[in-house]
Amino acid sequence: MKSKRRHSGRDVNGILLLDKPKNFSSNQVLQKVKSLFAARRAGHTGALDPLATGMLPICLGEATKFSPFLLNADKRYRVTAYLGHKTETSDAEGSVINKREITFTQPQLEEALEKFRGPILQIPSMYSALKHQGRPLYEYARQGVTLDREARRITVFDLQCLRWEGHELELEIHCSKGTYIRTIVDDLGEVLGCGAYVSDLRRLQVADYTHDSMVTLEKLEELTLKNNTLGSAIDLLLLPIESTALHLPEVNLESGAAACIKQGQPVSFFDNPTDTMVRLTEGGERHFIGIGIIDAHGRIAPKRLLRNVSDAL
C-alpha cells in the first residue's frame, strides 16, 4: 500500500502583492516566494510575460482557494509601444518582420485609440498560453504553425495616451480579464498604418489592489536575511484573505447559520441582494468565513470557504 505524499512547508495564509521583476517567468518568482515563506501551498493569479513587470498577486495557503476571483478581475497596465516596427511575437523578444514610416497625426492617434475603448472583439496572439488540443498556442507558433483562433469579447474600460515621442507611445489601459495587451498594441499599430510592438509592460493594478502595496523580491530576501525567526517579518507583508472579496456585498451570519454554511448547507436570508456573490462574515466581530452565492429565492449557498475562522487573519 502506497503512503500518501505529504507536502512540506508551513501553513501560512494570505496574499502577497509581488512586484515581479523583468526577465523572470511568473512561475519562477512564485517558487521563489514560496521558498522564502517556506509555505506549504502557493499559487499566482494570472501570469505576466517574462519581459513584463509589476503586480503579481501570490496566494499562500487557504488564499489559493480564492485565486480565481483575482484571475477574473479587472486589471490596469502601463505599456510602452515601439512604433514603426512589427514583430512576430508583438513584443521585443520577436524578430522584426515589417518596418514602416510613422505618418499619422495626433488627431488620427486619438481616433485610432477610440476604436479600442469599450466592449471589443479580440483575436488572441499565436504567441499566447491559450491551449489547443492540450498544447499552448506559442508551441505551435514556434513551429511555424498558425491556427484559427476565435475572437473573444473583452472590455477596455479606459485607454489613455500618456506620451508620444517619435517611435515611443506610452499608454495606460484598464481592461477586463482575458485582455492581451500585446494584441491591443499590435492591432493599434495596424490601424495607425505603421506597425507597433510592446517594448515595456508594467501591471499597476489587479482588482482593487493598487501599486503602492507591492513588495519586491529584494525586500523579501532582505527581511528574510535580517530575521532569524521563520516568517516573523515577511508574514506582516501579507494581506488578509478577505481582501479578495471586499468588493462584494457583505452578509453577516449569526453562529447557527454560519455553522450550516460551513457544513455546506444553504441557509435562507432575507433583505439581501439576489442572484449574486456575497462576502460571508460571522458574528459581531464579523470574521470572514468565505464567499457565498444568493439565489433568486434568497437562499445562500457556500462557494468558497476557509478551513477555519483563524485562517482569515
Curated annotation (Swiss-Prot):
EC number: 5.4.99.25
CDD domains: PseudoU_synth_EcTruB, PUA_TruB_bacterial
Any GO MF annotation of the entry: RNA binding
One GO biological process term: mRNA pseudouridine synthesis
Domain of life the protein comes from: Bacteria
Binding-site residues, substrate: H44, Y77, Y180, L201
Positions annotated as active site in the UniProt record: D49
Keyword entries, A-Z: Isomerase, tRNA processing
Chemical reaction(s) catalysed: uridine(55) in tRNA = pseudouridine(55) in tRNA
Family: Belongs to the pseudouridine synthase TruB family. Type 1 subfamily.
Function: Responsible for synthesis of pseudouridine from uracil-55 in the psi GC loop of transfer RNAs.
NCBIfam families in the cross-refs: TruB
Name of the protein: tRNA pseudouridine synthase B
Gene coding for it: truB
